[in-house]
């Protein structure tokens, strides 16, 4: 269906079509929605787990090479993650935009958003790679350990070769997920774990008489896995199965209008800025950890790595909820969107509680995946109860913020997240950990307190949201025609 085709037949104006859709909304089959959401969540979790596992695989292998290797990779990843996560988070605007376009049955518009996303991340990958090559200045500032700095610089420069393919993969993955196409992404993500593990082992330790590359083999393995993902997904979904044709009108430079770019950036901009500011704060948190010793740096890397894996497991419901909320809002179905939001909340709480119990019962076993150092394990166990508490609170907070993101309401999440991490988490970590001598535990006490505040604010904002108004805005935005970029699309800027 072309972008200029009417999406809701029988009415001429965007406003009247939206009002008609809202008035005629069908009842929601809760059982069917639950199973559909769960199936989507399972596949999103598997693909997200696979993506996060690529980083954790590096940590697991490097942790067995020694504390210096793990600390170097951790510090390098902490600083390189600032710009990369910013661009990647900006690309998640595709979930909202493609999801709403798909829900409005405007496939061509979903393809346009993908094109814009690919161009934006390609342009932004250049300064990100430059940042990777200049990381030595920040590492010198972070630690006095010359060996850690040297290893960290090598790690970051090799890893720079993975920037562009990882961003392209993110765009294509989110594009297909917003349409409900999950299985290929899950399969590719799962296979990439095997590729990363095999590449890490062979490149670090060698095989068939070859001695391997040692430390340098780990980032090189990540580069190989990063290229494997987009090549495999594009080859299967686009070149072979041609799944994109249902939401793709072909490359069209005329689609890159200033108004569309503004709509994209009005969603991507706050999310990207929030991610960069938050990750910069996390990097500053690593400086606090550095003041407590290299063992604390390594322990924090282990705890953060475990949190990432647990996040991947519960995020399935968060991402699936965001996608389905965007779909239903784009289709003009606020009642269904609200039901999906509630289902996502209940399922997330249930999943997080199970994961928290499992994490507590397994105790040191999970941490031994990263290191066998007894001193390191004791540090990790010291903060395990605080870590589990923070994880549970943050999981619910992220779910609610994802619902707001599905509506396109990203400004409030960006401001709250940015201010809370700088004005609450960091001061608590520094004064508690360094000034008051509470040590490593203070870092995670800061996380808990910050997440309680964020959860409270996001819950308040969501409780006051007019779902019908959000659906009408989404329908209006996704009904914009290519002949009227300064009309309806211009009006949508205040909502994006």
Predicted segments with their positions:
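Helix-terminus/linker motif at the lipid-water interface of multi-pass membrane proteins
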Residues: 52-71, 139-146, 204-213, 272, ...
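Short alpha-helical transmembrane segments in multi-pass integral membrane proteins
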Residues: 2-44, 98-164, 191, 195-269, ...
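Signature of the first transmembrane helix
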Residues: 12-21, 33-95, 266-289
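Transmembrane alpha-helical segments of integral membrane proteins
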Residues: 202-203, 398-399, 424-433
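Small-residue-rich hydrophobic transmembrane alpha-helices
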Residues: 59, 70-129, 133, 169-185, ...
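Small-residue hotspots at the loop-to-helix junctions and early N-terminal turns
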Residues: 67-78, 152, 156, 294-309, ...
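Transmembrane helical elements of multi-pass membrane transporters/channels
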Residues: 39-58, 158, 192, 225-229, ...
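Residue-level hotspots within the lipid-embedded alpha helices of multi-pass solute transporters
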Residues: 48-52, 85, 125, 129, ...
């Amino acid at each position: 269906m072309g972008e200029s085709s009417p999406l809701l037949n029988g009415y001429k104006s965007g406003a009247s079509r939206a009002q008609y859709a809202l008035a005629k909304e069908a009842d929601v089959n809760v059982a069917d929605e639950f199973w559909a959401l769960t199936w989507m969540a399972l596949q999103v979790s598997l693909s997200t787990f696979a993506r996060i596992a690529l980083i954790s695989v590096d940590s697991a292998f490097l942790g067995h090479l020694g504390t210096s290797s793990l600390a170097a990779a951790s510090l390098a990843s902490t600083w390189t993650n600032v710009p990369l996560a910013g661009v990647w988070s900006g690309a998640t605007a595709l979930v909202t935009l493609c999801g709403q376009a798909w829900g409005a049955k405007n496939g061509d518009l979903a393809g346009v958003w993908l094109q814009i996303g690919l161009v934006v991340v390609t342009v932004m990958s250049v300064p990100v790679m430059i940042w990777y090559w200049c990381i030595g200045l920040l590492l010198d500032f972070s630690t006095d350990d010359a060996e850690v700095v040297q290893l960290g610089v090598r790690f970051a420069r090799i890893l720079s070769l993975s920037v562009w393919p990882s961003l392209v993969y993110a765009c294509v993955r989110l594009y297909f997920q917003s349409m409900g196409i999950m299985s290929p992404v899950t399969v590719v993500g799962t296979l990439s774990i095997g590729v990363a593990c095999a590449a890490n082992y062979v490149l670090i330790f060698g095989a068939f008489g070859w001695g391997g590359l040692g430390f340098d083999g780990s980032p090189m393995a990540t580069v190989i896995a990063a290229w494997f993902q987009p090549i495999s997904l594009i080859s299967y979904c686009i070149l072979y199965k041609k799944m994109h044709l249902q939401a793709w009108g072909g490359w069209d430079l005329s689609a890159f209008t200033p108004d569309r770019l503004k709509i994209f950036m009005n969603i991507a901009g706050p999310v990207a800025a929030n991610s960069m500011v938050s990750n910069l704060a996390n990097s500053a948190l690593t400086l606090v950890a550095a003041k407590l010793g290299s063992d604390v740096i390594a322990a924090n890397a282990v705890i953060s790595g475990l949190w990432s894996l647990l996040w991947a497991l519960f995020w399935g419901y968060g991402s699936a909820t965001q996608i389905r909320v965007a779909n239903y809002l784009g289709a003009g179905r606020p009642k269904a969107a609200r039901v999906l939001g509630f289902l996502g909340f209940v399922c997330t709480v249930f999943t997080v509680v199970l994961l928290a119990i499992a994490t507590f019962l397994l105790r040191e076993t999970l941490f031994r995946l990263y290191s066998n150092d007894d001193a390191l394990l004791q540090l990790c166990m010291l903060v395990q109860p605080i870590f589990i508490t923070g994880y549970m609170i943050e999981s619910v907070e992220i779910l609610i913020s994802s619902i707001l993101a599905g509506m396109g309401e990203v400004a409030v999440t960006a401001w709250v997240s940015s201010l809370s991490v700088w004005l609450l988490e960091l001061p608590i970590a520094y004064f508690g950990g360094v000034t008051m001598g509470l040590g490593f535990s203070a870092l995670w006490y800061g996380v808990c307190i910050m997440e309680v505040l964020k959860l409270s604010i996001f819950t308040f904002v969501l409780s006051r949201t007019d779902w019908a108004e959000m659906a009408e805005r989404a329908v209006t935005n996704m009904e914009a025609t290519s002949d009227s970029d300064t009309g309806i699309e211009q009006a949508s800027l205040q909502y994006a």
